[in-house]
Amino acid sequence: MKKIRLELVYLRAIICAIIIITHLLTQITLKHENMEGGSLVLQFYIRNIVIFGTPCFIILSQLLTTLNYQKVTYRYLTTRVKYILIPYILMGLFYSYSESLLTDSSFNKQFIENVLLGQWYGYFIVVIMQFFILSYIIFKINYNLFNSKILLLLSFILQQSFLYYFTNNTAFHDTVLHYYPLSENTIIFGWIFYFFLGAYMGYNYERVLNFLERYLVIMIVLAVATYFVFIALANGDYWNVTSFSYSLTPYNSIMFIVILGICTHFKTILFNTIQMISAFSFFIYLLHPIILDSLFAYTNIFEDNTMVFLAISLLFILGLCIGVGMILREFYIFRFIIGKQPYKLNINAY
């Protein structure tokens, strides 16, 4: 029986909330499309502070894989097709239909561009599915490769080199997009280090926890330092905020480690709520952008007080997504929409 690791339950819930906050801050920026000067720069740096959500989900996904498995069968892939890829497609169908109505455009066009090519917020699932296949291949070769410091270093060099040239070399950028058919955000070379970092941490999980018990403060200082490095490397494009950036790789990676270290100190605080957010995190990730615009139309009245705006918006989004998820959970067939984790929740029946 797998040991329940409370720190990972808290970690998944916090990362989920961080992604929602990222999208809420984006909504504020989009509302003020004429923003410029100091206000735009401030928004840019605030948004980048919490941009680590998607990289952290990639790290966490692979950490859980190498932590819980030492060998895998073909069922490893089929399970992920059923409970990750199929929900992605089904929610994508709903999103494409709603977007076709909203924009008075073709459903087929919306589905192909968004779901098949990954030109929507769900692109992250396309990345994750590629890494599941890569993980399966490595398991079949040798599980101990996940413990390779050389592979970890090479993946860092590959990711940083790819992102640097993709961002700064027009010829390289255009050549890649000419031959790669999907959204640029789904190219795994731009995320490959996060995959191997998660794998390495999962393989050495107890050692990682022991390290964080002693050196968490140092990691927090490093997180601040790497963010200042990002500031120094900023290119002046204050509208474009993305985690698909070489200058944010160290910061994103260290923030995952920092949050994991902080979560090791949580045992019971808001545990029932945290447990539900964690269990429904995949469904929340897919559903919340669909309702975000409508909800923002109300909550933006609190925009002048950013903390109040974020707190109320986060509460409503989590409440709506979990509420819908709890209703769907009553019917086992909806595991192909909400995933299988919600069915593991220990909820008393009356």
UniProtKB/Swiss-Prot annotation:
GO terms for cellular component: plasma membrane. It is a multi-pass membrane protein. Pfam families: Acyl_transf_3 (PF01757). The lineage of its organism: Bacteria, Bacillati, Bacillota, Bacilli, Bacillales. One of its GO terms (molecular function) is O-acetyltransferase activity. It is found in: Cell membrane. InterPro entries: Acyl_transf_3_dom. This is Probable poly-beta-1,6-N-acetyl-D-glucosamine export protein. Presumably involved in the export of the biofilm adhesin polysaccharide poly-beta-1,6-N-acetyl-D-glucosamine (PNAG, also referred to as PIA) across the cell membrane. PANTHER family: O-ACETYLTRANSFERASE WECH.
